[in-house]
Design a protein with these regions (language model features):
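Preference for solvent-exposed, low-hydrophobicity sequence contexts
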Residues: 1-99, 113, 122, 141-142, ...
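Conserved P-loop NTPase nucleotide-binding/switch module
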Residues: 194-218
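The conserved Walker
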Residues: 103
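Active-site catalytic pocket residues across diverse enzymes, especially alpha/beta-hydrolases
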Residues: 118
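Conserved lysine of the Walker
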Residues: 107
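A short acidic (Asp/Glu
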Residues: 136-138, 205-209, 216, 233-236
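Nucleotide-state-sensitive switch-loop elements of NTP-binding domains
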Residues: 77-100, 122-195, 199-202
Length: 395
């Protein structure tokens, strides 16, 4: 249950850190949220395991409501680093900027700040490549969104195109992740007002090689490293494409999330995109479906591989699997339904094929299915991550 709303005074040059689940409303004075200026009746929402910095230059009174586990903390300074403001001021009207940094380094906050400070000059394109903690698309996907007005959160942007990757991190299968980014890049074309957010996988040679490839594919004009140390390979890749490389500080206050919190955030997102799902059954011969990551493999063989691997791992739910059907086990493979000229797939949980030859899946989508691409993440019917299929091909 949300707590009773309380009014908190925020002193001049101070920041109220709203920790979700929580909401706030400006009662008196003025606020700035990552470059966004809310009105007095607007409710600002911090989702679970996320935070919003509400900065007041001259002081304000804010009405705050906290959900279970939420919080509010006032710090006596502006938590946005000075070098963020300097970076924003240095950008002209045309730029393609990519932000790279480790998890919980403030990448999304920086992208949001740059978006809000530049969108008043004209529309902005945002590419979200963080397939595990995306703001604008489901987990296991990357996306493009076009924005035309400021917003306290990038989650308010509607995706223009969504590209399934199949995993929650490029570390599972970098080749597949790069293929998806290349497809996204071809859609962007020569767009000159672009912000690119990336995932937080930066430690190790494979991670740095992957980020270098992102630079080479997207050819940004600016590469921004946030809170990072030595990165010679990223410097080299930036020089190859003629990008200006800049280092900026992490925010002064960052909400740290452990592995379980990031997993819980993904599960909330699955639930959001699968809300209203029901079990559908259609004859297998009517369904055009293929494995997303092994397009040449027959779907039935892929199902056997998924179920067999779970059995080898001694997963307890496989005892309830009946042949190629997982309905009784209450699990399904996260999949992507395409129809018509839509550029955003609907999500589904593919439960397998029953002994009567019917394909069974949970989805909120009610229309005709042109293609179902079956991914690699296994979820329960209450949208918990149960298992991830190991890549069978080289990364």
């Amino acid at each position: 249950m949300p707590s009773e709303a309380k009014r908190l005074p925020v002193g001049p040059n101070s920041t109220l850190i709203l920790k979700g689940p929580a909401s706030a409303r400006l009662v008196e004075g003025s606020l700035e949220v990552l470059g966004y200026r809310p009105g007095s009746k607007e409710r600002l929402v911090a989702k679970p395991w996320r935070s919003l910095p509400l900065y007041s230059r001259e002081g304000a009174i804010v009405e705050v409501s906290l959900g279970e586990g939420g919080g509010a903390e006032i710090v006596g300074e502006d938590t946005i680093p000075d070098d963020w403001r300097e970076l924003s001021s240095s950008l002209g009207d045309s730029f393609r900027l990519m932000v790279i940094g480790m998890v919980d380094s403030g990448k999304t906050s920086l992208i949001t700040y740059l978006y809000n400070t530049h969108v008043p000059r004209g529309r902005m394109v945002v590419a979200d490549l963080d397939m595990g903690q995306s703001e604008i698309c489901p987990p296991t996907t990357i996306a493009l969104a076009i924005g035309g007005k400021p917003s306290p959160s990038l989650s308010a942007l509607e995706p223009n195109r969504v590209y399934p990757v199949g995993y929650t991190s490029p570390s599972y299968l970098t080749s597949r992740a790069l293929e998806s980014v290349a497809e996204l890049s071809s859609t962007i074309g020569s767009e000159r007002r672009l912000l690119v957010n990336t995932d937080g996988w930066v430690d190790g040679e494979a991670a740095r090689r992957h980020k270098s490839q992102l630079i080479r594919i997207l050819k940004p004009s600016h590469v921004v490293l946030i809170g990072m140390g030595e990165a010679d390979d990223l410097v080299e890749a930036s020089e190859e494409v003629g990008a200006e490389l800049t280092r900026v500080s992490a925010p002064k206050v960052v909400l740290k999330r452990d592995h379980s919190a990031r997993k819980a955030l993904r599960e909330l997102s699955y639930a959001r995109y699968l809300r209203g799902a029901r079990l559908r059954s259609i004859p297998r011969r009517w369904l055009r479906a293929r494995p997303l990551l092994l397009a040449g493999l027959p779907l039935e063989d892929y199902l056997r591989e998924v179920i067999g691997e779970m059995e080898e791992s001694a997963h307890h739910l496989t005892m309830l699997v009946n042949g190629l059907e997982m309905t009784e086990a209450g699990i399904g493979i996260l999949s992507y339904i395409w129809a018509g000229d839509r550029h955003e797939p609907s999500l589904a949980l593919f439960m397998g094929i029953d002994d009567k030859g019917f394909a069974r899946f949970y989805t909120p989508y009610e229309g005709t299915i042109e293609l179902m691409e079956v991914g690699a993440v296994i979820l329960s019917t209450d949208y918990r991550e149960v298992y991830v299929l190991r890549p069978r091909i080289n990364v």
